[in-house]
Amino acid sequence: MQTFNIAVLSGDGIGPEIIAEAIKVLDVVQQKYAFKLNYRTFDVGGIAIDNHGTPLPEATLKGCEESDAILFGSVGGPKWEHLPPAQQPERGALLPLRKHFALFCNLRPATLYKGLEKFCPLRADISAKGFDMVTVRELTGGIYFGQPKGREGEGANEKAFDTEVYHRYEIERIARVAFETAMKRSKHVTSVDKANVLISSVLWREVVCDVAKDYPEVTLDHIYIDNATMQLIKQPEFFDVLLCSNIFGDIISDECAMITGSMGMLPSASLNEKGFGLYEPAGGSAPDIAGKGIANPIAQILSAAMMLRHSFNLNDAATAIENAVKNVLAEGHRTADLADESQPLSTKQMGDLIAQAVE
């Protein structure tokens, strides 16, 4: 029997509540599909600051190193906002984890599920068509990490600067992820750049075109970032796989999230070249609803499904979870973020229904 070790980092806010439901669903799936998951829990984020004085303790990092994947909840909250930026939960935990494990690729699916069209902020005739896309975002290069960056001078001559840097190998490896992802979907990649202005985007487009030659079955088109943000509003159904640099992917993936109607529905995966990944919901720690038992656990549950698919190659088990979510939603069950006039389900009730729906 295949056995996998998972580092469970519940974190802060709603993290522990939604992680509990993801594990509940994983426990059902591992019994039905004959594999074994070993969980080890570690502090991260604000709770780690409270208990250990740092958002990413050595024991947590070591536990992650000894695991096959990281199932991550959420970090942060008002309690720790007074700390220096580098010591705050988000910057002091997530960014070091991404760097330590060389998590260069972020996958963010965005799907408008049947029955949830009315929660989409787009016009009814657009949302009625539905959409199912994934953003493939380069995560470790680009303007967020390029050097030099800084501030200097004073008075009217004071200036600040950042540098957008991309190497050919960085673009090539993220492009290959996008094309491989498209091969398992609708075979369509849209590469987002600003090649009419930025030299880094000129190289980006050249390398993407080179990689595309290895995938003749995949349709490739290019779109400028400004036009991409417009077309996502006008015709989201056109897109399948969106390939983006770090900063453009940051923008696009959040726009995709917004048009689905709820951040509580959106999973994500951050992967390295060896298939090791950190899996987390796209939303934040939501301290305003933490402890109330009303958070939507679906994003966390779907993140667990992504873990089974991308790190463990358990595609059937992952699909079983995704189908369970679709079926529960199709039956009209909703948590508070998606409730209309019906009585909303609690976090636990939604987790129970999805676990029961796994086939």
From Swiss-Prot:
SUPFAM superfamilies attached here? Isocitrate/Isopropylmalate dehydrogenase-like
Entry-linked PROSITE patterns: IDH_IMDH
Residues engaged in binding NAD(+):
77-90, 284-296
Q: What class of enzyme is it?
A: oxidoreductase
One Gene Ontology cellular component term attached to this UniProt record is: cytosol
Q: Which coarse location class applies to the principal site listed for this UniProt protein?
A: cytoplasm
Cofactor(s) needed, names only, are: Mg(2+); Mn(2+)
Keyword Membrane listed? The answer is no
Annotated positions binding substrate: 98, 108, 137, 226
Pathway, per Swiss-Prot/TrEMBL? Amino-acid biosynthesis; L-leucine biosynthesis; L-leucine from 3-methyl-2-oxobutanoate: step 3/4
Matching Pfam families: Iso_dh
| Annotated EC | 1.1.1.85
Q: Which reaction does it catalyse?
A: (2R,3S)-3-isopropylmalate + NAD(+) = 4-methyl-2-oxopentanoate + CO2 + NADH
Site: Important for catalysis. Where?
144, 194
- Range of residues in the leader sequence: none
Paste the cofactor note: Binds 1 Mg(2+) or Mn(2+) ion per subunit.
**Gene3D superfamilies, per database record:** Isopropylmalate Dehydrogenase
Q: What function does this protein fulfil? A: Catalyzes the oxidation of 3-carboxy-2-hydroxy-4-methylpentanoate (3-isopropylmalate) to 3-carboxy-4-methyl-2-oxopentanoate. The product decarboxylates to 4-methyl-2 oxopentanoate.
**Protein family (similarity comment):** Belongs to the isocitrate and isopropylmalate dehydrogenases family. LeuB type 1 subfamily.
The record describes its quaternary structure and partners as:
Homodimer.
Name listed for the protein in its UniProt record: 3-isopropylmalate dehydrogenase
